[in-house]
């Protein structure tokens, strides 16, 4: 908002007042440069993730990522690729039970869609995302279906010691269009 306002100010004034618009332009540029992009984006149901790789681009993983969701993630990131671009899924290793993608730091982010994959990923990954309830003995940092039911979609920012999490719906927020959804039991996913 600052950048366009400054440009309009510079354009419409013909007196020395026009130079006041430079302050808005500078503020807009500084604000744009200070925007930190998330390292991991988690869909509201935990069936799809986007992970920022070493090249600075997002890699999409998971079978639950609709073209609409992927398009929104890419646009919010300033990425002009199309959802059907094969390069979007190039850094992920996926099968019907889940996916594994590496962050720029080399950490492994796992998306576990089945109980069997969740148990294995809890041992091997640094971060596990799952629509299921995480087991108590999971050694990895985990985002599970119980948390996602309360928060909706998430953005995660790696800070060296863990992740700073930004929720699309703060815990406790309830609106008619954003009711808490039931989490399927692990056996419901395994039957798919």
Model-predicted regions and their roles:
Residues 52-192:
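Extracytosolic and intramembrane catalytic regions of membrane-associated proteins
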């Amino acid at each position: 908002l600052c950048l366009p306002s400054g440009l309009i100010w510079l354009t419409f004034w013909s007196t020395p007042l026009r130079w006041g618009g430079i302050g808005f332009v500078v503020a807009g540029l500084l604000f744009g440069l200070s925007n930190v992009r998330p390292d991991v984006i988690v869909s509201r149901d935990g069936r799809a993730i986007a992970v920022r790789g070493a090249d600075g681009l997002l890699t999409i993983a998971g079978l639950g990522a609709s073209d609409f969701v992927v398009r929104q993630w890419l646009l919010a990131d300033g990425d002009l690729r199309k959802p059907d671009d094969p390069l979007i899924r190039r850094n992920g290793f996926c099968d019907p039970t889940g996916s594994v993608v590496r962050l720029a730091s080399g950490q492994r982010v796992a998306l576990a869609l089945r109980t069997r994959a969740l148990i294995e990923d809890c041992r091997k990954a640094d971060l596990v995302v799952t629509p299921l309830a995480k087991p108590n003995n999971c050694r990895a940092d985990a985002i599970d279906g119980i948390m996602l039911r309360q928060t909706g979609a998430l953005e995660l920012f790696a800070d060296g010691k863990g992740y700073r999490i930004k929720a699309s719906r703060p815990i406790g927020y309830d609106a008619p269009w954003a009711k808490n959804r039931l989490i399927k039991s692990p056996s419901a996913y395994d039957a798919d």
